[in-house]
């Protein structure tokens, strides 16, 4: 980058995305700000293009967009092997069912769901675009 070029400003959703990542127990590392900012721009551009929206995103898409940005960022960290959480234990068995009267609980213990698979499923849930949400905001382009 030359001296005349400036770094891109932080995306308006940047702070919300950082808060969301911290709520998952992710600790920010050096260099994450640029990656988060890139994910903000990437996901926002996808939504703008899919919905044919010119101008700012509708406020009702804010938290949807924050989750998609968080998922995109975590997916890139996971795929490069640079992801670790402090608060989420993917080794713990997931609860399959829970009954309150006469207290019974069963856990979803399956050999096909190892911690890495659970982590990937969690990230996919965040990152996968729910087009039913986006269809509500889609506009025709003439």
Locate the predicted segments by residue.
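Conserved short "hinge" loops at termini or chain/domain junctions
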Residues: 1-64, 117-142
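Short loop/turn elements at secondary-structure junctions
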Residues: 3-9, 71-142
